[in-house]
Amino acid sequence: MYRFYVSSYAKGKEKGLYVCTLDETKNELHLNKHIPTEDFPSYVIKKDDFLYVSLKDARVGEGGGVASYHIEEDDLKQLSFYNSHGRSYTHLCLSPDQKYLFTANYHVGATAAFPLKDHKIGDKLSVVHHHGSGIDLLKRQTSPHAHYV
């Protein structure tokens, strides 16, 4: 049996995180639990018994950010949430010693670092706002877009 996690941008009550399993002996996928979230979960990192999740703002400037969860069998217990007030993170990365969480923000072209203590996300330590533009200035390359960190 393999357990895995799915993030969903679904509208209404369906948005959130899903705990699923794959039963290789029967070639079956199972949806074990839905964990609702206020914002749209996006990028997910699983490390040991913890999930780190980027959340896209679903509350018009009031939400978005990053959250950490403790994995408890077929459930997730939220440990922390950093509200980015409308800013959503495209990609996440953990430091090898798991003391820091790094984020990339596509929409504002920035990267940031957060401290982790007992897998809880602390206040932002540092932000780097990138500068520049692409060759297509009429459409979508008028500013930087961080894709990955």
How would you describe each model-predicted region?
Residues 1-12, 16-22:
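An edge-strand/N-cap motif at the start of beta-rich repeat modules
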Residues 1-2, 48-49, 97-99:
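Short coil/turn segments that connect the beta-strands within blades of beta-propeller domains
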Residues 6, 52-54, 103:
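Residue position within the beta-strands of beta-propeller blades
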Residues 10-13, 57-61, 107-110:
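Short glycine/acidic-enriched loop and turn motifs that connect beta-strands
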Residues 13, 39-40, 62, 88-90, ...:
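Beta-rich catalytic cores
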Residues 16-18, 64-67, 110-112:
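A short loop-to-beta-strand structural motif that recurs across blades of beta-propeller domains
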Residues 43-46, 94:
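Residue-level recognition of a conserved intra-blade site in WD40 beta-propeller repeats
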Residues 76-148:
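Asp-box/WD-like beta-propeller blade repeats and closely related beta-sheet repeat scaffolds
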